[in-house]
């Protein structure tokens, strides 16, 4: 006998704090089954999270996202734990205070926030095809609206560094560009791709060096929303009353125009090249 209303399954990256943690709480409340892929462990004093871990409704896998051996091991674990995925939330990210590089030698924001979400999407593609909702939500940002120029060479090898409005913003734009570019091909298999700006959220943590400009911090503390607001925007992109077209970039749950959209094919070609030549052959 088939179960009535079986649990839907979501994979959420970057869910041990901030927006991702709030999204995890929301989906647990809605009776989703969640596989969390994080660099850090969940808070030990969060009773809701720890209860879900104990019951098996929430499963936690840890990995260094920008180390391909570590990432591959984690994705293998996910595939071994579920045959189908309803929604993939590519939420892991962050902004650094200095220019840094990944284990593969690429600028860290580009690796973590542009390339790795594509790798995760490709590696979980067959599981998404088997899901009922077949949706990918990539967490983006409107920070890229401040960019005056954008190109692939600068994205991979920036000559200078600027907090928030430099490599961070460029990598989020590139994420939304490949999302839009890959959407039509994915729809042939019924998979819908979205990139979503979660808005301004107070995600400051006292134990972490901030990649924000100094003048943003007091504004964030005073005026930015609790991370549950951003989590709700990610949640509603999939489960809200409006069904958005695949490839859309959403701001306040409405489709918005992407700048530099003519470079989408170049960005998609590059991340796919990295996936095939670097990730698959590592």
Give, region by region, the residue ranges found by the protein language model.
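Conserved glycine-rich Rossmann-like NAD(P)H-binding loop of the short-chain dehydrogenase/reductase
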Residues: 30-45
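Short alpha-helical oligomerization interface
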Residues: 98-112
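Conserved glycine-rich cofactor-binding loop
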Residues: 16-17
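Conserved NAD(P)H cofactor-binding loop of Rossmann-fold oxidoreductase domains
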Residues: 91-97
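Catalytic loop of short-chain dehydrogenase/reductase
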Residues: 97-101, 129, 133-188, 197-211
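Short alpha-helix in the Rossmann-fold core of NAD(P)-dependent oxidoreductases
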Residues: 110-124, 137, 171, 223-226
């Amino acid at each position: 006998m088939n179960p009535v209303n079986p649990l839907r399954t979501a994979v959420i990256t970057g869910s041990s704090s901030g927006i991702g943690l709030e999204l995890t709480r929301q989906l647990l409340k809605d009776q989703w089954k969640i596989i969390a892929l994080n660099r850090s462990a969940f808070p030990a004093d969060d009773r809701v999270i720890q209860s879900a871990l104990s019951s098996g409704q929430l499963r936690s896998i840890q990995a260094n996202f920008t180390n391909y051996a570590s990432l591959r091991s984690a994705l293998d674990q996910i595939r071994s734990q579920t045959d189908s995925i309803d929604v993939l939330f590519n939420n892991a990210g962050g902004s650094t205070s200095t220019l840094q590089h990944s284990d593969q030698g690429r600028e860290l924001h580009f690796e973590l926030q542009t390339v790795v979400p594509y790798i995760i999407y490709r590696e979980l593609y067959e599981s998404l095809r088997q899901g009922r909702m077949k949706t990918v939500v990539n967490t983006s940002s409107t920070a890229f609206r401040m960019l005056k120029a954008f190109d692939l060479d600068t994205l991979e090898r920036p000559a200078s560094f600027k907090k928030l409005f430099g490599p961070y913003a460029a990598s989020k734009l590139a994420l939304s560009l490949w999302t839009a570019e890959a959407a039509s091909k994915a729809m042939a298999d019924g998979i819908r791709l979205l990139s979503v700006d979660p808005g301004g959220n107070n995600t400051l943590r006292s134990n972490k060096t901030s990649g924000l400009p100094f003048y943003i911090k007091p504004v964030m503390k005073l005026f930015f929303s609790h991370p549950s607001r951003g989590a709700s925007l990610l949640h509603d992109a999939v489960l809200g009353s409006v069904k958005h077209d695949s490839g859309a970039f959403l701001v306040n749950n409405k489709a918005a125009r992407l700048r530099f959209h003519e470079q989408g094919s170049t960005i998609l070609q590059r991340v796919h090249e990295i996936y095939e030549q670097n990730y698959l052959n590592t």
